Amino acid sequence: MAAGVAARTLRGLAVAGGGETSDSEDDGWEIGYLDRAAQKLKGPLPTEEKNETFKKALTTGDILLVKELLNSGISVDSSFRYGWTPLMYAASVSNVELVRVLLDRGANASFDKDKQTILITACSARGSEEQILKCVELLLSRNADPNVPCRRLMTPIMYAARDGHTQVVALLVAHGAEVNTQDENGYTALTWAARQGHKNVVLKLLELGANKMLQTKDGKTPSEIAKRNKHVEIFSFLSLTLNPLEGKLQQLTKEETICKLLTTDSDKEKDNIFSSYTALGDLEIFLHGLGLEHMTDLLKERDITLRHLLTMKKDEFTKNGITSRDQQKILDALKELQVDEIKFGELPEVTKLEISGDEFLNFLLKLNKQCRHLITAVQNIITELPVNSHKIVLEWASPRNFTSVCEELISNVEDLNEEVCKLKDLIQKLQNERENDPTHIPLIEEVSTWNSGILKRTALAVCGFGFLLFICKLTFQRK
């Protein structure tokens, strides 16, 4: 009984990727007894017994017995109870030698069971990346199509990206896999890699031309998916305006791409491509995003921080050896980073005697709306701000600088609150005088009540904004 439980447990490991399960509980496979000694046929076997022996030879990885059974006439594409072929099973456990033997004997590399292809099974197998890579390479060499999706429209490259297999992703693209295909939920291979936190896969996909702006069905980009799943570093460089790696390998031929991707020493490749993205400061990320990596050493030698770089004048750029072309890239990036200031010039000139009540009401409504926007902005900052300092990826200035700015903000909000209270008192005084004027014809009660309500809401919004800034100040002080 214990052996049966173990067999069922290990059988689950051979289920094809994406959660595709067998339609039959009693599938006839006994997976897990890989330490059995190689066996030989003692004589001709009945067909039913031969099939059972074939299954056992496959599950134990007995290559010699598999060859002997194939020589005896058993079909290399035998279909067992739940529809899997021997090749699909071999791919699911990343048995490279078994895959090679079966393919050499004519096994169909393009077979699928309910749209679950052998290539998808290999890409989602539970094994080392080296074994998976070799199995995938063998299948591709026998013309397995890398763009055939499963029932959920996931292609092999999505499974490889989801499981963090960088080299497998590169190999699939080299054989024609579409990088930007989307599954039933709108996920691309890049989205899956970002969701699972596989940084090297994300970088490789960007290098291979992945579109980081494609959205899922719920309107999320890969960077937003990474942020939602707490992968802050991936979110940081996916959010960059430019991508220095994008399309780097797209112009190479298939053979050149395979050679470049698979013969390069993995450690050297990481040093040349990925090391610049590990433990980066904000200056390095900014420069990489603009394709200005060559400026990193120059700026560090001169102790130029990102804050200093972003506030430089033209003569300072030239003085520090920054070329006109590089200057323009930085200035263009600055334009994108700028936030529109609140424009109060459009508000009516209250001092004019001919101003109407509607114009003044419009002024108050706009002021109230701006206050609400400010409150929402601070609430978002409080929500997104990391609680622990070790979660901050970019280099930050001293928290004291932020605290001092918050203190100044609180002071300004208190002043604003005081001025709004004065405005309210003044309007209330004018209202009282008009009500006591015997020549005044009173307005409709509803309008007066509504105007008073607007003033109250404005005052409450300003007070609420001050309270939120006070909370923000306490948050920074705790840090």
From Swiss-Prot:
ANK repeat start and end residues: 49-78, 82-111, 114-148, 152-181, 185-214, 218-247
Domain of life the protein comes from: Eukaryota
One GO BP annotation of this record: cell differentiation
Subcellular location: Cytoplasm
SUPFAM superfamilies, per database record: Ankyrin repeat, Pseudo ankyrin repeat-like, SAM/Pointed domain
The entry's keywords: ANK repeat, Cytoplasm, Developmental protein, Differentiation, Meiosis, Phosphoprotein, Repeat, RNA-mediated gene silencing, Spermatogenesis
Pfam families attached to this UniProt entry: Ank_2 (PF12796), Ank_4 (PF13637), SAM_2 (PF07647)
Ranges for domain SAM: 276-338
Phosphoserine sites (modified residues): S22, S24
GO CC terms, sorted: pi-body
InterPro entries: Ankyrin_rpt (IPR002110), Ankyrin_rpt-contain_sf (IPR036770), Asz1_SAM (IPR042650), SAM (IPR001660), SAM/pointed_sf (IPR013761)
Primary site of residence: cytoplasm
Role: Plays a central role during spermatogenesis by repressing transposable elements and preventing their mobilization, which is essential for the germline integrity. Acts via the piRNA metabolic process, which mediates the repression of transposable elements during meiosis by forming complexes composed of piRNAs and Piwi proteins and governs the methylation and subsequent repression of transposons. Its association with pi-bodies suggests a participation in the primary piRNAs metabolic process.
Oligomeric form and interacting partners: Interacts with DDX4, PIWIL1, RANBP9 and TDRD1.
Protein name: Ankyrin repeat, SAM and basic leucine zipper domain-containing protein 1
Organism for this UniProt entry: Rhinolophus ferrumequinum (Greater horseshoe bat)
